[in-house]
Curated annotation (Swiss-Prot):
Free-text function comment from the UniProt entry: Essential protein that is required for a late step of 50S ribosomal subunit assembly. Has GTPase activity that is stimulated by interaction with the immature 50S ribosome subunit. Binds to the 23S rRNA. Required for the association of ribosomal proteins rplP and rpmA with the large subunit.
Lineage, highest ranks first: Bacteria, Bacillati, Bacillota, Bacilli, Bacillales
PROSITE patterns: G_CP (PS51721)
Organism domain of life: Bacteria
Record's subcellular location: Cytoplasm
Binding locations of GTP: N58, K59, V60, D61, N131, V132, G133, K134, S135, T136, G175
Record protein name field: Ribosome biogenesis GTPase A
Self-association and partners: Interacts with ctc. Interacts with the immature 50S ribosome subunit. 2 molecules of rbgA bind to one 50S subunit.
Signal peptide span: none
Molecular-function annotations in GO: GTP binding; GTPase activity; RNA binding
Organism (species): Priestia megaterium (strain DSM 319 / IMG 1521) (Bacillus megaterium)
Length: 288
């Protein structure tokens, strides 16, 4: 399923999440560790209001560990629980349950004080934009394949409760929430990491953004991957250097810029060049 976000779809997604909030104790806000700010829903704070929340930075294996720690420090300063996880490999799964119990300790203490000897399982809902790994996280927590997974945005379609041991019940929310497109750069970050379909933006433009970012922040990885002694300042020359070295050519030996763009983005997404984080906590648009 491909989600094209229009006002009607946004209103429906918000309504679905809001309705289910009445049923749950805690929200797991799933973001991409490479773009923790850009992969947040723009209205998430409004939508979940006063519900306890844990921010889960997924795909941490693809992110710059130094910047991931900066993001964790940032969330701590904001008074927000945050965990760095890798749902694909199962990293951080136990901490999700233990952190949830810690956050909800007072609530369950009150239940015991009222005579509830054995409080029920924690009820949680995962929210996030498409393709941040929601289904993968559900499958990992449940220790079996329940939710359909894939690399295409918006692959989850049905709504279901998932029991995770005796301590946690997960609500899988269909349609998830829409990404924000507040400015061009956010769109490029979403496209670079594969959070939105490649047909939404021009892939050459996305690759230009990605290469300029890597040139500025991760030049050594870029030089090593493409055997460059120096990185050309001119972006066309950089495309030419990469395309010619990797055989992205048209007839007559001319570099095929479309193929070069596809190559660069594919190698970023599959970690062939290295691990990167495109959002910096110092540039966070607003406190959580």
């Amino acid at each position: 399923m491909t989600i094209q976000w229009f006002p009607g779809h946004m209103a429906k997604a918000r309504r679905q999440v809001t309705e289910k909030l009445k049923l749950i104790d805690i929200v797991y806000e799933l973001v991409d560790a490479r773009i923790p700010q850009s992969s947040r829903n723009p209205m998430i704070d409004e939508i979940i209001v006063n519900k306890p929340r844990i921010v889960l930075l997924n795909k941490v294996d693809k992110a710059d560990p130094r910047v991931t720690q900066q993001w964790l420090d940032y969330y701590k300063e904001q008074g927000i629980y945050a965990l760095a996880i890798d749902a694909q490999a199962g990293k951080g799964m136990k901490q999700i349950v233990s952190s949830s119990k810690e956050l909800l300790q007072e609530k369950f203490d009150r239940m015991r004080a009222k005579g509830v000897k054995k409080p029920r399982a924690i009820r949680a809902m995962i929210v996030g934009i498409p393709n941040v790994g929601k289904s993968t996280l559900i499958n990992r927590l449940a220790s079996k394949k329940i939710a359909k997974t894939g690399d295409r945005p918006g692959v989850t379609q049905a709504q279901q409760w998932i029991k995770v041991g005796n301590e946690l019940e997960l609500l899988d929310t269909p349609g998830i929430l829409w990404p924000k497109f507040e400015d061009e750069t956010v769109g490029y970050k979403l496209a670079t990491t594969g959070a939105i379909k490649d047909t939404i933006l021009n892939m050459q433009d996305v690759a230009v953004y990605a290469l300029r970012f890597l040139t500025s922040h991760y030049p050594e990885q870029l030089k090593q991957r493409y055997n460059l002694n120096e990185i050309p300042e001119d972006i066309v020359e950089l495309f030419d250097a990469i395309g010619s070295r990797r055989g992205c050519l048209m007839g007559g030996g001319m570099v095929d810029y479309d193929k070069t763009a596809e190559l660069v983005l594919r190698e970023i997404r599959t970690d062939k060049i290295g691990t990167f984080t495109f959002d910096d906590p110092s540039e966070a648009e607003q406190p959580l």
